[in-house]
Amino acid sequence: MSEVITVKQTNMENIYECEFNDGSFRLCTRNLVPNFNVYGERLIKYEGVEYREWNAFRSKLAGAILKGLKTNPIRKGTKVLYLGAASGTTISHVSDIIELNGKAYGVEFSPRVVRELLLVAQRRPNIFPLLADARFPQSYKSVVENVDVLYVDIAQPDQTDIAIYNAKFFLKVNGDMLLVIKARSIDVTKDPKEIYKTEVEKLENSNFETIQIINLDPYDKDHAIVLSKYKG
């Protein structure tokens, strides 16, 4: 296996780039829980610090960063509501980034999958798993505070509407949303670019200002991620 030569801070807080002796580069985050990985990712020791390799083929946020995300609203101390947290791959890296003074509320609908998320959260006190349906934010309103960032990665035809509805409950004015648009979950017959355009129009008609749209290919085919700011 290739060995790490250097680890450098990127222009995004708490996100690093690891360079290996085979000439390759990988994103990584500083491991909040040393000696433990989450999804089989490589642990990298460099100058007394342990980092976790962040696989862009397993995490759409990592893919977005490698595809040119201009700014990452998730930083040290950020409060995040994550819809579609699944078994914890991406939210574990969010946990590394926000550190212990941040909070990541992870909503997941599948009882089987949320059990895996609970195992991740047992070692990471800044992750708060919630077994809930994102279509009904009223059901977790009593436990989720207002957040700085809403991250949405759910495979539903009305995924954008669900995101907007949750923003009305939880996202601070001038907060940021990262919405993963899964074109094939919305309409398998349409050109993904047309779907992205339609979904962005929905956001803009609901007081969101579009900052950036990123096509996630080759990391995730027929997916885009939209960064927008909520105007309330």
From Swiss-Prot:
Q: Name one GO biological process term.
A: rRNA methylation
Q: Name one GO molecular function term.
A: RNA binding
Keywords attached to this entry: Methyltransferase, RNA-binding, rRNA processing, Transferase, tRNA processing
InterPro entries xrefs = Fibrillarin, Fibrillarin_CS, SAM-dependent_MTases_sf
One Pfam family of this chain: Fibrillarin
Source species, domain of life: Archaea
- CDD domains given in the database record: AdoMet_MTases
Q: What is its EC number?
A: 2.1.1.-
Q: Which residues bind S-adenosyl-L-methionine?
A: T89, T90, E108, F109, D133, A134, D153, I154, A155, Q156
Assembly and partners?
A: Interacts with nop5. Component of box C/D small ribonucleoprotein (sRNP) particles that contain rpl7ae, FlpA and nop5, plus a guide RNA. These sRNP particles form homodimers, giving rise to an asymmetric holoenzyme.
Concerning its family, UniProt says: Belongs to the methyltransferase superfamily. Fibrillarin family.
Q: What PANTHER family does the database record attribute to this sequence? A: FIBRILLARIN, RRNA 2-O-METHYLTRANSFERASE FIBRILLARIN
Job description of the protein: Involved in pre-rRNA and tRNA processing. Utilizes the methyl donor S-adenosyl-L-methionine to catalyze the site-specific 2'-hydroxyl methylation of ribose moieties in rRNA and tRNA. Site specificity is provided by a guide RNA that base pairs with the substrate. Methylation occurs at a characteristic distance from the sequence involved in base pairing with the guide RNA.
Entries under HAMAP family matching the protein = RNA_methyltransf_FlpA (MF_00351)
Q: What is this protein called?
A: Fibrillarin-like rRNA/tRNA 2'-O-methyltransferase
Q: What species is given as this protein's source? A: Saccharolobus solfataricus (strain ATCC 35092 / DSM 1617 / JCM 11322 / P2) (Sulfolobus solfataricus)
The gene name on file is flpA
